[in-house]
Regions:
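N-terminal periplasmic "start-of-domain" segments of outer-membrane beta-barrel proteins
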Residues: 29-37, 60-74, 142-181, 200-201, ...
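Short, acidic, small-residue-rich periplasmic hinge/interaction motif at the N-terminus
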Residues: 50-57, 110-173
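Short loop/turn motifs that connect adjacent beta-strands in outer-membrane beta-barrel proteins
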Residues: 288-291, 320-321, 380-383, 429-435, ...
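Short acidic/polar hinge/loop motifs at secondary-structure boundaries
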Residues: 219, 236-265
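Extracytoplasmic beta-strand/coil segments of soluble accessory domains associated
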Residues: 105-108, 156, 185-236
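N-terminal periplasmic accessory domains that precede
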Residues: 105, 183, 187, 217-220, ...
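Transmembrane beta-barrel wall of Gram-negative outer-membrane proteins
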Residues: 287, 303-443
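C-terminal beta-signal and adjacent terminal beta-strands/loops
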Residues: 669-671, 781-784, 826-832, 854-915
């Protein structure tokens, strides 16, 4: 109760402080638009390039879609004044730029009359919401991009002390993908395991992924699980998917509605609160299109029957001070059957045999999705700006798979997911330096799944429904405090309230999961420019300090405070060194803290040993049955983490050549992480009894209980909230030789991972066109789990269904006139089924993709104008995924869905037309 009062006082104090800040005198002049900015923008359509400039610099550029229609911009990289950067982008387009109030830029026709450009530094560099009516001249159909910056509450300012990768709309659509999930999956920093549509039954070492009954897909940075990556839509949270609510289903977000995706490879609980342990994926929607755009795409595998159809329609209208945009997308994909991939081994059933009817077994489910996004913005007077976004998506999935205990053939599964969200944002300029922002939102996710008989004990189809919802409201004040030698101190102060609910109801059975949570928070952030280039300090061209902190109070887990500090040092022009340290806090997901899912099964030990080739630990265990438990333990604790990052960024432009180098090191210590108990050698849970019999110290006490008494057996069975299952020849809970609790979800002692991300990009304007080359690499140095402080550390890296140490993605591009081509090389290093001496090697996997596009500009035929056609071929050489042993309990076939794909060669053609 005392903590609640303290937090309320903090929130009231935050509100009072924001009002006082609005009344303070201006202590010094703003740095203005003469401060140099670092930009790295690929050659693209002029509108996309200007939006990329706004995203990277935090400075809005006001223009109409008609002004930039059919115009392109050359690539620019390096350090520029904002005005010089925009002038480089519009060079040769017949446009010119003038500076408006509020630190904005306004594009005009080169021959238009008007006031000359003001001298750089004469205007305030406040890149907040733009009052279009205060621009020097009134032009029709003007609008300003909303600058959403990931990893900060500061408006229009992107602290450079943390590693952030921005992927533009042109990069996303030009990568050959058809869905948001596909684009997230190809990022080197993302691990393909966890909750995805490729693993409907989950993965052995990720208990959360086993609750993904609706075939959703979540971002999984650093391989720490989808629940450790915070996924945002326009900077706001979404209601989570799965029966435990541990991830946002990115496959529900239409790719044609996206403006850009920003990936923060750093902890961010000091800004966003819980869940931002491994990083943040912020999907920012398009909100400023003027006109109409139609997109069609058809694709197919070259071996098999899978086909894919995508169609979208965008309609937008911009006017002075506002805009409205709607995007509809339809997506339909057939299933990929195991029969189409004869080199992939079918799964092994619990009776020891292989699934025999493989012509119906799906490696990838069929799905049909419809999505709609609406967004609007309106300026009301000089000070108030209102905006809103609404999102709805409906997906149906169907597949044939193997039930967990099926001993005969296959069963159909169907699932439906519905996701809806609406946000409202109001910005009010209290003064020239202070902006007050209020944001409110609601999001919900509903999913239902239907499966044919999965267990012999169940005589009817299994039906399951999950509903999750999220309400939130926040109030943030942004202001300038006073001026340091390097420039003005920027500050953000705010409070937030959030309510989360989740309920999981299997039809005809008791509720499995039921949880609700209220979260109140107060947070603050400071940007301190200690040294700027104007001071001419030797060896310190720029030095900045970023401080942020957040206090969250959870209705079910108390309060937590998480700080973060970041430092940026620019010793010379174009070279920036950065480092950050912060802490994070994540309460158990609602579906875990409110879980009623304890259950288990009885199997014959000789049967499971024969399938997995497990040696008999002791003659006393011959012929016994064993009881294995699963589900969620009681008395779960919150997860906490400490994250350290360090890196550099280097950009250099010399004539027609430009070079970018980036490197980042990360070190994450994840304590009390929820998961199943790791087994030495990263082996299956069924190997644990053999290890425990020889050396009990390998596991926490009570993990494996040998020769339990009848009272101990009865106590375990009495705690079950699900029906007991019998398999492998066992018919009763008698002759129990041991109880195996390895598969029970509980708090582990620690998970630690360290790694390096690197990027090198080169571009040249040659006689043949614009040449580009880029290589992205992710190298994991360590990835270890420890069940308790007294048990050995288990190394999970380079083992089956877990992260592989080295991932590469290389690109070679050529743009000449209206034609653009890109050749992509993907590589995943070799690894093994486990770290045990008897492990089976798994070869490396490399694929090559080709993406071609042609845009009709200044076409003689009017209907071809502003039309783009494209061809993409992924996995040109039709490389099969590396073969791996099948996995019994999870109905996994003979490939690793976490590190490869069964799709094979896939070709697609696309058509995009703007009106």
């Amino acid at each position: 109760m005392g903590q609640s009062k303290d937090l309320r006082r903090s929130l009231l104090g935050a509100a009072a402080f924001s009002v006082l800040m609005s009344l303070q005198p201006a202590y010094a002049q703003s740095a203005g638009n003469n401060a140099r900015v670092e930009v790295s923008i690929e050659a693209a359509a002029l509108g996309d390039s200007l939006r990329a400039f706004s995203a990277q610099s935090g400075i809005p550029v006001i223009f109409s879609e008609k002004q930039v229609d059919g115009k392109s911009a050359a690539a620019i990289r390096g350090t520029f004044t904002p005005l010089a950067a925009v002038e480089r982008l519009i060079e040769g387009t017949g446009l010119r730029v003038v500076e408006g109030q509020g630190g904005t830029f306004v594009l005009r026709e080169a021959g238009a009359s008007g006031q000359p450009s003001t001298r750089a530094g004469d205007t305030t560099a406040e890149p907040a919401r733009v009052a279009v009516s205060r621009a020097p001249e009134q032009l029709p159909e003007l609008r300003a991009d909303t600058v959403v910056v990931t990893g900060t509450s500061l408006r229009g300012l992107a602290p450079e002390s943390s590693p952030v990768e921005t992927f533009s709309r042109a990069e996303i659509l030009g990568s050959g993908v058809t869905s948001t999930e596909q684009f997230i999956r190809i990022l080197p920093q993302n691990f393909g395991g966890g909750s995805t549509e490729f693993t409907s039954r989950g993965l052995p070492d990720d208990s959360n992924s086993q609750r993904n009954f609706a075939f959703g897909s979540g971002a999984n940075l650093r391989g720490l699980g989808a629940g450790a990556t915070l996924t945002l839509l326009n900077g706001a949270r979404l209601a989570p998917a799965s029966t435990i609510g541990d991830f946002v289903d990115v496959s529900m977000i239409p790719v044609n509605a996206i403006d850009r995706i920003e990936v923060l490879g750093d902890g961010a609980s000091s800004v966003y609160g819980g869940d931002a342990v491994a990083g943040v994926v912020n999907i920012i929607l398009r909100d400023d299109f003027d006109g109409a755009e139609t997109s069609l795409r058809f694709g197919s595998v070259t071996q098999g029957a899978l086909e894919e159809v995508q169609a979208s329609q965008s309609l937008g209208r911009s006017w002075q001070g506002g805009n409205l945009l709607g995007t509809y997308e339809y997506f339909n994909r057939g299933s990929l059957r195991l029969a189409d991939r004869p080199d992939i081994q079918p799964p092994t059933l619990l009776n020891g045999g292989a699934a025999g009817v493989t012509e119906f077994l799906d490696l990838l489910p069929a799905q049909e999705r419809q999505s709609l996004v609406l967004s609007g913005r309106q300026q009301l007077g000089d000070r108030l700006s209102l905006s809103s976004t609404a999102f709805y998506s409906d997906r149906n999935v169907s597949t044939f798979g193997v039930g967990i205990a099926n001993t005969i053939t296959l069963g159909p599964s169907r699932a439906q997911s519905k996701n809806a969200a609406v946000t409202f944002l109001a910005d009010y300029e209290l003064s020239a330096r202070t902006v007050l922002s209020f944001e409110a939102g609601y999001s919900e996710n509903h999913s239902e799944s239907f499966s044919q008989v999965q267990f012999p004990a169940v005589a009817a189809p299994v039906r399951d429904a999950t509903d999750s919802s999220l309400w939130s409201a926040s109030l943030i004040a942004n202001t300038e405090l006073f001026t340091l030698p390097g420039g003005p101190i920027r500050a953000a102060l705010g409070g937030q309230f959030r309510r989360e609910e989740l309920i999981n109801r299997p039809f005809g059975r008791p509720v499995l999961r039921n949880g609700e949570r209220d979260v109140s928070a107060a947070f603050a952030e400071l940007h301190l420019p200690l040294v700027s280039a104007d001071l001419a300090v030797p060896g310190v061209r720029r030095l900045e300090l970023n401080l942020s902190g957040r206090v969250d109070e959870y209705s079910d887990f108390g309060s937590t405070a998480n700080p973060k500090i970041g430092v940026l040092w620019e010793p010379v022009n174009a070279l920036r060194l950065r480092a950050s340290y912060g802490t994070s806090f994540a309460p158990p997901k609602l579906g875990l803290s409110g879980a009623l899912d304890l259950g288990g099964g009885v199997l014959r030990y000789d049967f499971i040993r024969s399938i997995l080739n497990i040696p008999l630990p002791d003659p006393s265990l011959a012929g016994v049955n064993y009881l294995i438990t699963s589900g969620t333990a009681n008395d779960l604790e919150p997860e906490t983490s400490q994250t350290f990052t360090a890196g550099f960024d280097f950009d250099h432009v010399a004539g027609r050549h430009d070079l970018t180098l980036k490197g980042s090191f990360y070190d994450i210590r994840y304590e009390d992480r929820l998961g199943i108990t790791p087994v030495p050698g990263n082996l299956n849970a069924n190997f644990a009894p053999g290890f425990a019999f020889q050396d009990p110290s390998l596991f926490p006490e009570g993990t494996v209980v040998f020769f339990p008494s009848q009272a101990e057996i009865d106590a375990v069975l009495a705690s079950f909230e699900r029906p007991l299952i019998f398999a492998g020849g066992a018919t009763s809970a008698t002759n129990i030789g041991f109880i195996n609790n390895v598969a029970l979800t509980r708090n582990l002692a620690t998970t630690e991972t360290r790694g390096i991300d690197a990027q090198i990009a080169y571009g040249m304007d040659a006689d043949v066109g614009r040449l580009t080359a880029r290589l992205d690499a992710s190298y994991i140095l360590d990835f270890t789990n420890q069940a308790s402080p007294t048990t050995p550390v288990v190394d999970s890296i380079n083992t089956l269904y877990n992260p592989v140490d080295l991932k590469l993605r290389g690109q070679l591009g050529l743009s000449r006139g209206n034609l653009a081509s890109n050749l992509v090389f993907n590589y995943i290093d070799d690894y093994a089924t486990s770290s045990a001496p008897t492990a089976v090697p798994i070869r490396s996997w490399s694929t090559v993709d080709l993406i071609l596009s042609y845009e009709f500009r200044n076409a003689r035929t009017r209907w071809l104008e502003n039309t783009q056609i494209g061809l993409s071929v992924t996995n040109i050489f039709d490389r099969d995924p590396p073969p791996v042993p099948t996995q019994t309990s999870f109905a996994l076939t003979g490939y690793d869905p976490a590190n490869s794909s069964p799709l094979g060669r896939f070709a697609a053609i696309s058509l995009r037309k703007s009106f």
